[in-house]
Design a protein with these regions (language model features):
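Sec-dependent N-terminal signal peptides of Gram-positive bacterial secreted proteins and lipoproteins
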Residues: 22-47
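Bacterial lipoprotein signal-peptidase II cleavage site
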Residues: 41-67, 71
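Short, well-ordered beta-strand elements
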Residues: 80-91, 109-115, 182-183
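Short helix-initiation/N-cap motifs at beta->coil->alpha
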Residues: 113-124, 212-239
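Ligand-binding "clamshell"
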Residues: 144-156, 170-171, 243, 248, ...
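A conserved helix-loop-strand patch within extracytoplasmic ligand-binding domains
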Residues: 156-205, 307
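A bilobed periplasmic-binding-protein/Venus flytrap-type ligand-binding module shared by bacterial periplasmic
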Residues: 163-174, 278-291
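Periplasmic-binding protein-like
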Residues: 191-200, 301-321
């Protein structure tokens, strides 16, 4: 019989072939496992990367939005206010204006107050465009100034009345005035007339019947004591007191000089022609009556808060008329 027998050598070869086959299978499984693991890791990494990218983008967008909002807020905070420049005598006009500075700032305006100690420069500065408004004078003075100087200024609001008073210099009682006593009065036309009317009301002089608010020393028709009328610039009247017997002084300059209307020898009556005529006004150049600046200024000044301030601060020396 020619059947091939299984020798030891043959058995060994079979076993060796079997082991090689198993190694190949195991290696294939290992490769597949590694490939699957790599795929899973790659997928997770991709998802994490995408999530990280999204989070980064969201953070960046939020930061940019916040920075944009902060920038807008900063720009709003630092936005320049539009200036309203107003000329005024110190007392009470500049002091009254100071009360509305914060209110105007809330409305977008920076109130700049320029103080003057005379009655000419505030009007020339307003006419020349150096000011947006002024606040120091009454209507008769404004009308007279326009007529004499060819200016174009108009009143936009009446604010308060300041009673004119006779104040003691060398003499403290009117009945003690002697022959030839000196009396200081303002040297501008309208305020001089007002002073003369006050002297007339006290029986010290008599004026022409039609003199009225245009009265000057030339309109004096009776002067029993032969009083010496000294015409002095209004801002200097308080300083003149040591050199004269009495002086007729505007309410604002009296207050500025430390005088109290309660201490005056005589004061304009509340029902006098002066009280009806001499309210102090806010003035602007013609053509600016309805400007946004003018309206904002007038609304701020003609308020209950300002009225209360005037009454509490000045008493009978300054009387609101609005």
């Amino acid at each position: 019989m020619n059947k091939k027998s299984d020798t030891p050598t043959s058995l060994y070869e079979k076993e060796e072939r079997g082991e090689n086959i198993m190694k190949k299978k195991n290696f294939t499984v290992l490769l597949a496992t590694l490939a699957l693991g790599a795929a899973l890791l790659t997928g997770c990494g991709s998802q994490e990367s995408t999530a990280d990218d999204a989070a980064t983008a969201e953070t960046t967008e939020t930061t940019e939005t916040t920075e944009s909002a902060d920038s807008a807020a900063d720009a709003s905070d630092t936005q320049e206010l539009e200036t309203i420049k107003v000329g005024a005598s110190i007392t009470p006009h500049a002091e009254i204006l100071a009360q509305v500075k914060d209110k105007l700032a809330e409305e977008g305006y920076d109130l700049e107050i320029v103080e003057y100690n005379d009655y000419v420069l505030p009007n020339t500065a307003l006419e020349d465009g150096e000011l947006d408004a002024n606040f120091f004078q009454h209507q008769p003075y404004l009308d007279d100034f326009n007529a004499e100087n060819g200016t174009h200024l108009v009143s936009v609001a009446a604010v308060h009345f300041e009673p004119f008073g006779l104040y003691a210099g060398k003499t403290s009682i009117l009945d003690e005035l002697k022959e030839g006593a000196s009396v200081a009065v303002p040297n501008d036309t309208t305020n001089e007339a007002r002073a003369l009317l006050l002297l007339e009301a006290q029986g010290l002089i008599k004026l022409k019947e039609d003199a009225g608010l245009s009265a000057t020393v030339l309109d004096i028709v009776e002067n029993p004591l032969n009083l010496e009328i000294k015409e002095i610039e209004a801002a200097q009247l308080v300083r003149s007191l040591p050199d004269v017997d009495i002086a007729a002084i505007n309410g604002n300059y009296a207050a500025e000089g430390g005088l109290n209307v309660a201490d005056a020898i005589a004061v304009e009556a509340s029902d006098s022609l002066a009280a009806d005529t001499y309210a102090n006004v806010i003035a602007v150049k013609e053509g600016n009556e309805d400007s946004a600046k003018t309206k904002a200024l007038v609304d701020a000044v003609l308020s209950d808060d300002v009225k209360t301030y005037i009454n509490d601060t000045y008493g009978n020396a300054v009387i609101p008329v609005f």
